[in-house]
């Protein structure tokens, strides 16, 4: 799977959430990852949110959209307590 993102947004995401988009992309390798639509953040394009464990062992929430040939990462952060529960309950 090919990933893309805006480099300025990626830098800002590290400052704000301490999560790189390179790490965020590894969430999609988690066989237990959960994905669904994110209608609250879909103004102008359909966005999705995926909860999964990264290659660094952190449970992350990754906001993304699908583009021809791949996935565009929009933001990434650690999950909230409620999101952790959703992931753990599968």
Which residues does each predicted region cover?
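Ribonuclease/tRNase effector modules and their secretory precursors
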Residues: 1-90
């Amino acid at each position: 799977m090919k990933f893309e993102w805006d480099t300025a947004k990626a830098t800002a995401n590290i400052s704000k959430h301490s999560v790189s988009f390179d790490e965020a992309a590894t969430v999609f390798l988690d066989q237990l990852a959960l994905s669904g639509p994110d209608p609250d953040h879909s103004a102008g394009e359909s966005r999705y949110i995926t909860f999964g464990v990264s290659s660094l062992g952190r449970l992350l929430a990754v906001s993304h959209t699908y583009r021809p040939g791949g996935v565009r990462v929009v933001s990434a952060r650690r999950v909230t307590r409620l999101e952790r529960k959703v992931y753990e309950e599968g």
